Design a protein with these regions (language model features):
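Short, ligand-facing micro-motifs at secondary-structure edges
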Residues: 18-22, 39-45, 52, 59-76, ...
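A short glycine-rich beta-alpha junction/loop motif
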Residues: 75-81, 96, 112-133, 256, ...
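Sequence-specific dsDNA recognition surfaces
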Residues: 7-53, 63-68, 188-205, 219-249
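Non-catalytic DNA-recognition/assembly elements of restriction-modification systems
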Residues: 1-17, 22-34, 124-140, 151-198, ...
């Protein structure tokens, strides 16, 4: 297939970009774009057109999930972290965007700490040449797959909101410390709270890219669930040497340094181990406290949790402060009622997640077919 150079099929409008520091921005209604999307809203605009913005530096280079190019339409302002491309006659703007979204930039970007796609290199990037009818047909198919993905993600978000609404309906707002004082208990009364000590990490832990036991880091904890698309391992022997930080079904994880208050619940024995900057919260008596209730309690009390943060060089919460978290704890029967509701919602979530994965596979296969 014939290929088109970007410099031949697009007008490159980089010279019209103007960066504005955050302190000098005048708030307004026009989107202010950077490498990865909207950064702010400002009172004026530079562009008023159908454009594709391609990350220059700070982009998601090399990612298979996060694009390096995106489409903008209408009045907007663009800073100097994104190349500005306007397709010439015969090139569909959406086709251009799809062709660049996950472009393989291996060998094209430079910079050790902040990778950069220079304009000179960008001009030599190539996209498949097709007539306008073919372009529009490809865009139509990709748009359908993308709309299904968006719809399924929206459905999942609504399920999350449904669970939160049910929690608040049953138990009230956990950020409100004035209510149900007679039912309030400190987490340290109901749970063991611990972490992987610094000397333990230094002396024993050697991360591996494959292995037997997954080290659960902060990036693996999100919205009550384990996110396992980026993991490090240790061997089982090392895990057994550090019994205090081994993880078991029902343990709750909470990030306590840097990004604070992200939580997840462990769902399997003999598979995970605690990494630095993540606290392990183990329920002492599960006849008084349900792990499902507890993880949602933490999820929905972020404002309260953040009130315990120490603002030093890196924001953090120590283990004693986590033990001092104080909450109104309902009866175990009420907790189980909420847990049953969550289980019912999770059944719907599994079906929607499967549909989402199928739609994503279709989108990925189409992108591979059309753009390699």
């Amino acid at each position: 297939m014939n290929m088109l150079l970007i410099e031949n099929c697009c007008e490159i409008l980089d010279s019209q970009r103007v960066p504005i520091t955050s302190t000098n921005r005048v708030k307004g209604n026009y989107p202010y774009y950077g490498a990865n999307g909207i950064q702010d809203y400002v009172a004026d605009y530079i562009f008023d057109d159908e454009l594709v913005l391609l990350a220059e530096d700070g982009g998601n280079f090399g990612s298979k999930e996060r694009p390096i190019a995106y489409r903008v339409s209408g009045k907007c302002w663009v800073n100097n972290h994104a190349h500005v491309l306007k397709p010439k006659v015969g090139l569909d703007v959406d086709y251009l965007c799809y062709s660049l979204m996950f472009y393989n930039t291996d060998g094209l970007v430079n910079g050790a700490t902040r990778q950069k796609l220079t304009q000179a290199t960008m001009k030599k990037m190539q996209i498949p040449e097709r007539n306008i009818e073919e372009q529009k047909e490809i865009v139509k198919k990709l748009n359908i797959a993308k709309s299904i993905i968006t719809h399924r993600r929206t459905q999942l978000e609504k399920l999350d909101l449904l669970v939160k609404a049910r929690f608040v309906e049953m138990f009230g707002d956990p950020n409100d410390t004035s209510r149900d004082k007679e039912k309030r208990h400190k987490i340290g009364e109901l749970c063991d709270v611990t972490k992987l000590a610094g000397f333990e990490f230094t002396e024993y832990i050697n991360y591996q890219d494959s292995g037997e036991i997954i080290m659960l880091r902060g990036l693996n904890c999100k919205q009550g669930k384990l996110i396992l698309d980026n993991v490090k391992y240790i061997d089982r022997e090392t895990s057994h040497k550090l019994p205090r930080s081994r993880l078991y079904i029902g343990d709750i994880l909470m990030t306590y340094a840097g990004t604070i208050g992200d939580v997840a619940m462990v769902d399997e024995n003999d598979k995970y181990h605690l990494a630095p900057n993540v606290a392990k919260i183990s329920i002492i008596n599960k006849k008084k406290l349900s792990p499902v209730f507890l993880v949602h309690l933490f999820m929905y009390s972020h404002d309260y949790i953040m009130s315990f943060v120490s603002q030093v060089a890196q924001a953090s919460i120590n283990m004693q402060k986590i033990r001092n978290f104080e909450y109104a704890i309902p009866s175990i029967e009420e907790q189980y009622e909420f847990e049953k509701f969550v289980q019912q919602v999770d059944k719907s979530r599994v079906a929607i997640q499967n549909d989402l994965e199928q739609a994503q596979m279709l989108f990925d296969s189409l992108m591979q077919e059309y753009f390699g």
